[in-house]
Protein backbone atom coordinates (compact mmCIF):
# COMPACT_ATOMS: atom_id res chain seq x y z
CA UNK A 1 0.00 0.00 0.00
CA UNK A 2 1.48 3.31 -1.16
CA UNK A 3 0.29 6.92 -1.14
CA UNK A 4 2.77 9.57 -2.27
CA UNK A 5 5.68 8.80 -4.64
CA UNK A 6 7.93 11.82 -5.10
CA UNK A 7 11.39 13.14 -4.31
CA UNK A 8 9.72 16.32 -3.06
CA UNK A 9 9.12 16.01 0.68
CA UNK A 10 5.77 17.29 2.01
CA UNK A 11 6.21 18.71 5.56
CA UNK A 12 2.56 18.41 6.60
CA UNK A 13 2.14 14.83 5.35
CA UNK A 14 2.75 11.79 7.53
CA UNK A 15 6.12 10.15 6.87
CA UNK A 16 4.31 6.82 6.61
CA UNK A 17 2.64 8.07 3.42
CA UNK A 18 5.78 9.32 1.67
CA UNK A 19 8.16 7.43 -0.57
CA UNK A 20 10.77 8.83 -2.97
CA UNK A 21 11.12 7.54 -6.50
CA UNK A 22 14.29 5.64 -5.65
CA UNK A 23 12.67 4.16 -2.53
CA UNK A 24 9.70 3.03 -4.61
CA UNK A 25 12.06 1.34 -7.09
CA UNK A 26 13.94 -0.28 -4.22
CA UNK A 27 10.74 -1.76 -2.80
CA UNK A 28 9.75 -3.11 -6.21
CA UNK A 29 13.21 -4.63 -6.66
CA UNK A 30 12.99 -6.19 -3.21
CA UNK A 31 9.86 -8.10 -4.20
CA UNK A 32 11.33 -9.08 -7.59
CA UNK A 33 14.58 -10.31 -6.06
CA UNK A 34 12.85 -12.33 -3.35
CA UNK A 35 10.67 -14.47 -5.56
CA UNK A 36 7.38 -12.56 -5.42
CA UNK A 37 4.98 -12.38 -8.36
CA UNK A 38 3.08 -9.13 -8.91
CA UNK A 39 -0.64 -9.83 -9.32
CA UNK A 40 -3.93 -7.95 -9.36
CA UNK A 41 -6.17 -8.07 -6.31
CA UNK A 42 -8.59 -10.36 -8.15
CA UNK A 43 -5.76 -12.75 -9.03
CA UNK A 44 -4.50 -12.71 -5.43
CA UNK A 45 -7.89 -13.78 -4.11
CA UNK A 46 -7.98 -16.65 -6.62
CA UNK A 47 -4.51 -17.79 -5.52
CA UNK A 48 -5.63 -17.86 -1.89
CA UNK A 49 -8.97 -19.52 -2.67
CA UNK A 50 -7.23 -22.26 -4.66
CA UNK A 51 -4.61 -22.68 -1.90
CA UNK A 52 -1.74 -22.29 -4.36
CA UNK A 53 1.76 -22.12 -2.91
CA UNK A 54 2.84 -18.87 -4.56
CA UNK A 55 4.57 -15.79 -3.19
CA UNK A 56 2.74 -12.74 -4.49
CA UNK A 57 2.31 -9.03 -3.88
CA UNK A 58 -0.54 -6.65 -4.77
CA UNK A 59 0.42 -3.02 -5.46
CA UNK A 60 -2.18 -0.44 -4.36
CA UNK A 61 -2.29 3.35 -4.07
CA UNK A 62 -4.78 5.45 -2.08
CA UNK A 63 -6.29 8.92 -2.69
CA UNK A 64 -4.34 9.32 -5.26
CA UNK A 65 -1.84 12.16 -5.80
CA UNK A 66 -0.85 12.92 -9.39
CA UNK A 67 2.75 11.96 -8.61
CA UNK A 68 1.60 8.34 -8.72
CA UNK A 69 0.86 8.85 -12.42
CA UNK A 70 4.04 10.79 -13.16
CA UNK A 71 6.53 8.89 -10.97
CA UNK A 72 5.21 5.40 -10.15
CA UNK A 73 3.17 4.52 -13.23
CA UNK A 74 6.09 4.65 -15.71
CA UNK A 75 8.00 2.13 -13.55
CA UNK A 76 5.00 -0.18 -13.24
CA UNK A 77 4.28 0.11 -16.97
CA UNK A 78 7.87 -0.69 -17.91
CA UNK A 79 7.90 -3.78 -15.69
CA UNK A 80 4.35 -4.87 -16.64
CA UNK A 81 3.19 -4.78 -13.00
CA UNK A 82 -0.57 -4.70 -12.27
CA UNK A 83 -1.80 -2.23 -9.67
CA UNK A 84 -4.95 -0.78 -8.12
CA UNK A 85 -5.67 2.90 -7.52
CA UNK A 86 -8.30 3.86 -4.94
CA UNK A 87 -9.73 7.24 -5.95
CA UNK A 88 -11.26 9.85 -3.67
CA UNK A 89 -13.64 11.31 -6.24
CA UNK A 90 -13.75 14.94 -5.13
CA UNK A 91 -9.94 15.06 -5.03
CA UNK A 92 -9.81 14.65 -8.83
CA UNK A 93 -8.30 17.78 -10.44
CA UNK A 94 -7.55 19.30 -7.04
CA UNK A 95 -4.03 20.66 -6.49
CA UNK A 96 -1.45 17.84 -6.35
CA UNK A 97 -4.08 15.12 -6.94
CA UNK A 98 -4.69 13.10 -10.07
CA UNK A 99 -6.16 14.93 -13.02
CA UNK A 100 -9.15 13.67 -14.94
CA UNK A 101 -6.95 13.39 -18.02
CA UNK A 102 -4.44 11.15 -16.27
CA UNK A 103 -7.16 9.04 -14.65
CA UNK A 104 -8.75 8.36 -18.03
CA UNK A 105 -5.36 7.34 -19.43
CA UNK A 106 -4.87 4.92 -16.56
CA UNK A 107 -8.30 3.37 -16.97
CA UNK A 108 -7.36 2.44 -20.53
CA UNK A 109 -4.39 0.39 -19.32
CA UNK A 110 -5.28 -3.23 -18.45
CA UNK A 111 -2.59 -3.17 -15.75
CA UNK A 112 -4.67 -0.66 -13.78
CA UNK A 113 -7.72 -1.47 -11.67
CA UNK A 114 -9.76 1.51 -10.49
CA UNK A 115 -11.21 1.32 -7.00
CA UNK A 116 -13.21 3.72 -4.82
CA UNK A 117 -12.01 5.64 -1.76
CA UNK A 118 -15.19 7.66 -0.95
CA UNK A 119 -16.22 11.06 -2.25
CA UNK A 120 -14.44 13.23 0.35
CA UNK A 121 -12.20 10.95 2.48
CA UNK A 122 -14.10 11.17 5.80
CA UNK A 123 -13.70 9.01 8.88
CA UNK A 124 -16.66 6.81 8.02
CA UNK A 125 -17.50 5.72 11.56
CA UNK A 126 -18.14 9.37 12.46
CA UNK A 127 -19.72 10.42 9.15
CA UNK A 128 -23.50 10.94 8.99
CA UNK A 129 -23.42 10.51 5.21
CA UNK A 130 -21.29 7.37 5.16
CA UNK A 131 -23.61 5.44 2.81
CA UNK A 132 -23.52 8.33 0.34
CA UNK A 133 -19.72 8.51 0.57
CA UNK A 134 -19.38 4.78 -0.11
CA UNK A 135 -22.05 4.36 -2.79
CA UNK A 136 -21.79 7.65 -4.66
CA UNK A 137 -18.06 7.25 -5.23
CA UNK A 138 -18.73 3.98 -7.05
CA UNK A 139 -21.49 5.58 -9.13
CA UNK A 140 -19.44 8.68 -9.96
CA UNK A 141 -16.29 6.77 -10.92
CA UNK A 142 -18.22 4.35 -13.10
CA UNK A 143 -19.90 7.28 -14.82
CA UNK A 144 -16.58 9.05 -15.42
CA UNK A 145 -14.48 6.08 -16.52
CA UNK A 146 -16.97 3.58 -17.93
CA UNK A 147 -15.30 0.90 -15.75
CA UNK A 148 -16.94 -1.42 -13.26
CA UNK A 149 -15.69 -0.21 -9.87
CA UNK A 150 -15.68 -3.32 -7.69
CA UNK A 151 -13.09 -2.61 -4.99
CA UNK A 152 -13.20 -0.15 -2.08
CA UNK A 153 -10.61 1.25 0.34
CA UNK A 154 -11.64 2.67 3.71
CA UNK A 155 -10.17 6.12 4.45
CA UNK A 156 -7.64 5.83 7.29
CA UNK A 157 -8.36 2.10 7.28
CA UNK A 158 -8.29 1.38 11.02
CA UNK A 159 -11.03 -0.20 13.14
CA UNK A 160 -11.23 2.95 15.26
CA UNK A 161 -12.69 4.85 12.29
CA UNK A 162 -14.52 2.03 10.43
CA UNK A 163 -17.66 0.51 11.92
CA UNK A 164 -19.31 -2.84 11.26
CA UNK A 165 -22.15 -0.88 9.68
CA UNK A 166 -19.69 0.75 7.25
CA UNK A 167 -18.33 -2.66 6.29
CA UNK A 168 -21.86 -3.94 5.67
CA UNK A 169 -22.57 -0.90 3.47
CA UNK A 170 -19.57 -1.68 1.28
CA UNK A 171 -20.94 -5.17 0.71
CA UNK A 172 -24.53 -4.03 0.23
CA UNK A 173 -23.85 -1.47 -2.52
CA UNK A 174 -22.09 -4.01 -4.73
CA UNK A 175 -18.36 -3.94 -4.11
CA UNK A 176 -16.45 -7.25 -4.23
CA UNK A 177 -13.85 -6.26 -1.63
CA UNK A 178 -13.02 -3.63 0.96
CA UNK A 179 -9.42 -3.01 2.00
CA UNK A 180 -8.12 -1.57 5.25
CA UNK A 181 -4.77 -0.28 6.48
CA UNK A 182 -4.40 -3.10 9.00
CA UNK A 183 -0.80 -4.24 8.59
CA UNK A 184 -0.89 -7.93 7.71
CA UNK A 185 -0.38 -10.12 4.63
CA UNK A 186 -3.18 -11.65 2.58
CA UNK A 187 -3.62 -15.24 3.76
CA UNK A 188 -6.43 -17.79 3.87
CA UNK A 189 -7.15 -16.57 7.40
CA UNK A 190 -6.98 -12.80 6.79
CA UNK A 191 -9.15 -13.03 3.66
CA UNK A 192 -12.09 -14.74 5.35
CA UNK A 193 -13.78 -11.33 5.44
CA UNK A 194 -13.38 -9.93 1.92
CA UNK A 195 -14.76 -6.59 3.08
CA UNK A 196 -11.99 -5.78 5.54
CA UNK A 197 -8.82 -7.08 3.95
CA UNK A 198 -5.44 -6.12 5.42
CA UNK A 199 -2.67 -4.20 3.66
CA UNK A 200 0.90 -3.37 4.58
CA UNK A 201 1.96 0.28 4.25
CA UNK A 202 5.18 0.74 2.29
CA UNK A 203 7.19 3.94 2.71
CA UNK A 204 10.74 5.22 2.51
CA UNK A 205 11.87 3.43 5.66
CA UNK A 206 10.37 0.03 4.83
CA UNK A 207 13.34 -1.22 2.77
Regions found by a protein language model. Give the residues of each.
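Generic enzyme active-site microenvironment
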Residues: 60-61, 115
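Histidine-centered catalytic micro-motifs
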Residues: 4-5, 114-121
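Acidic (Asp/Glu)-rich catalytic clusters
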Residues: 32, 73-81, 98-116, 143-145, ...
